[in-house]
């Protein structure tokens, strides 16, 4: 599956199959959350939250790809990500794009 954030793939013609998306809501262990809150007092990277967001993006992307495969897509174009805080220590990540099928592979 080809994944791009542009609305084209160089050298490929395709037909659009429709919108595909994947999402997840992730949270961290309460102990990690407390440790990270202390880190905000002194500054620096919040590695635990970085890991959480990376995991969430990967899972949302995987779910989007599964949806595209169910449509028989060869690629997903114009991929975008959005995130929002659901509550302290939890975030929702959404991946979405347009599933396409190549013409004259």
Segments from the language model and where they lie:
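Membrane-proximal amphipathic alpha-helices
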Residues: 86, 91-92
């Amino acid at each position: 599956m080809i994944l791009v954030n542009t609305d084209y793939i160089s050298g490929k013609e395709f037909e659009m199959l429709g919108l595909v998306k994947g999402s997840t809501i992730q949270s961290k262990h309460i102990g990690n959350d407390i440790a990270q809150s202390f880190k905000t007092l002194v500054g620096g990277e919040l590695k635990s939250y970085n890991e959480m967001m990376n995991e969430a993006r990967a899972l949302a992307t995987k779910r989007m790809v599964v949806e595209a495969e169910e449509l028989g897509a060869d690629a997903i174009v114009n991929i975008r990500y959005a995130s929002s805080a659901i509550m302290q220590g939890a975030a929702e990540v959404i991946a979405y794009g347009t599933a396409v099928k190549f013409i004259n592979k």
